[in-house]
Amino acid sequence: MFQTLAYYATVFHRSFTAYTSRHLQALGLNFGSLFPVIYVGKHPGCTQAQLTAALGLDWGYSQRTVTRLVEEGFLTREKSGRAYHLDLSPKGQQAFQVSHQVFFDWDEAALTPLDQKEREQLFALLAKVSGKEADSTCTKPFAAP
């Protein structure tokens, strides 16, 4: 039987997108807003250019997304010199908590068939093939200040 990583990546992506969309919809967010909200939550006061570069976004898409998030009350955008600095509003803080937690909740549901040792093996192998650290901030729950 021929298997590809791309197939499983697609299966997991679709499952994660559907799961996340259901949870974000209650807050008035869509899947496309997930990563900008998380980035600003982890990097308060960042500029839009920093957000755009860090997430690898197209400038136009980033502009539309940030404008929408500001208009809907999730982000604040304050001009400082020639740059705009982004922060989460109280509504954005709530969205950040839900958005961040959804990663761990989905993992728990998706990884139910695996025991702890198998989970550790899976993450070690994924870290190896992705070239990412197995102990990055994305793999640990967010501790609110």
Residue map of PLM features:
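N-terminal leader segment of winged-helix/HTH proteins
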Residues: 1-27, 74, 85, 94, ...
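Charged, amphipathic alpha-helical coiled-coil/dimerization segments
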Residues: 17, 67-127
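N-terminal positioning helix adjacent to the helix-turn-helix/winged-helix DNA-binding module
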Residues: 5, 32-33, 47, 84, ...
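Residue-level recognition of specific faces of alpha-helices
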Residues: 8, 33-39, 68, 102
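N-terminal helix-turn-helix DNA-binding core of bacterial DNA-binding proteins
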Residues: 14, 18-61, 73
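Conserved amphipathic alpha-helical interaction elements at protein-protein interfaces in regulatory
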Residues: 26, 42, 98, 128, ...
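Exposed, interaction-prone assembly regions rather than primary DNA-binding/catalytic cores
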Residues: 118-145
